[in-house]
């Protein structure tokens, strides 16, 4: 049974899973290798736990709201609880890899998977016997007696790379079975019945192991290259839904990429985002939130007492020292930055007032000069009239 209840690094890390994992994985690897493989094979990783923890140690009981649901699920599946669960773990001990049952490489009794899982694993009896009982028995016997037979043991050094490469390869097949596809194909063709399949499996193991390591190395390098290129592209062309709502669009010549990203979020387009932001500009959005989605800080309001004290201090001195600014901040329940900005604004206001006063004085002077000139002209005219008479 392939479920999360059999994995030591399962969904919640229940203590029953740790015992089942230790029993299921003891037939193929030591505890260190099984722990390293389980760290990469466990999906999803344990919540709040390190993936490199020692899985062979007995875990302490965790007080979690999920314990009751896990216990109920175990009882529902296995009936009497721990007894049936341990028996199930013993039954899958022979055909499990790293504590996990291989659902792809089941080529023993059913006679399946020529160039795929069965052949790549070296169990050629199932494929050569055309699905009969003799072929299945030959494959199982050869896998148990021959330490190199049966299902191939994935090298721990290749586990992360080959697993990533397997999932990156979209040509078909499973991440486990398609690694030894070519060697498995040769073994399945040569086996005509159960006995021939059992004899030929010894030759298939060596070829499968060589092809396994070669494919693992090649796929690992290809996986790293593909992963690096995908991360580079993702960092350069990252698009978020709020960009469309805000009317912003990254400069990318490939418009189809942007359209595909927008389509997966309900068909949002840049034009729709602009119309949406314009329609909400004057109706639903508050004053402190702009049309482009950026927060705009509101004006700081001061009480009458704070304004009076600040005006009194400004009347005494237009510039404050650091010590005096700290004292006023504590006295008025304001921050130093607020007081500093208030004094800056007050000095600018005073400067504008002084400039306005100067302009008014100049205008008054000009008006007085014009009046004086007009009066002098009138007096000169009157004086000239008297002289003419």
Curated annotation (Swiss-Prot):
Start-end of Low complexity biased regions: 138-150
Keyword set includes Ubl conjugation: no
- Residue numbers bearing the Phosphoserine modification: 174, 177
Record-given protein name: Homeotic protein ultrabithorax
Residue ranges for motif QA?
A: 368-383
Q: Mind listing the UniProt keywords for this protein, alphabetically?
A: Activator, Developmental protein, DNA-binding, Homeobox, Nucleus, Phosphoprotein, Repressor, Transcription, Transcription regulation
Instruction: Write out the function statement from the record.
Output: Sequence-specific transcription factor which is part of a developmental regulatory system that provides cells with specific positional identities on the anterior-posterior axis. Binds the consensus region 5'-TTAAT[GT][GA]-3'. This homeotic protein controls development of the cells in the posterior thoracic and first abdominal segments. It activates the synthesis of the decapentaplegic (DPP) growth factor.
The record's Pfam families line, in alphabetical order, gives: Homeodomain
What residue ranges does this record give for the DNA-binding region? 295-354
Question: Under the GO molecular function aspect, what terms does this record hold?
Answer: cis-regulatory region sequence-specific DNA binding; DNA binding; DNA-binding transcription factor activity, RNA polymerase II-specific; protein domain specific binding; RNA polymerase II cis-regulatory region sequence-specific DNA binding; sequence-specific DNA binding; transcription coregulator binding
Location of motif Antp-type hexapeptide in this chain is 239-244
Q: What is known of its domains?
A: The QA motif is able to mediate transcriptional repression.
Where does this one sit in the cell?
A: Nucleus
Gene3D superfamilies the record matches: Homeodomain-like (1.10.10.60)
Annotated GO biological process: anterior Malpighian tubule development; anterior/posterior pattern specification; cell fate determination; dorsal vessel aortic cell fate commitment; endoderm formation; haltere development; heart development; imaginal disc-derived leg morphogenesis
Which stretches does the entry tag as region Disordered?
138-189
- Phosphothreonine modification, residue list: 170
Q: In which tissues is it expressed?
A: In the embryo, expression is seen in the epidermis, somatic and visceral mesoderm, and the peripheral and central nervous system.
Q: Looking at the keywords, is Cytoplasm present?
A: no
Q: Please give the family membership noted in the entry.
A: Belongs to the Antp homeobox family.
Where is it found, in Gene Ontology cellular component terms?
Answer: nucleus; polytene chromosome band; protein-DNA complex; transcription regulator complex; transcription repressor complex
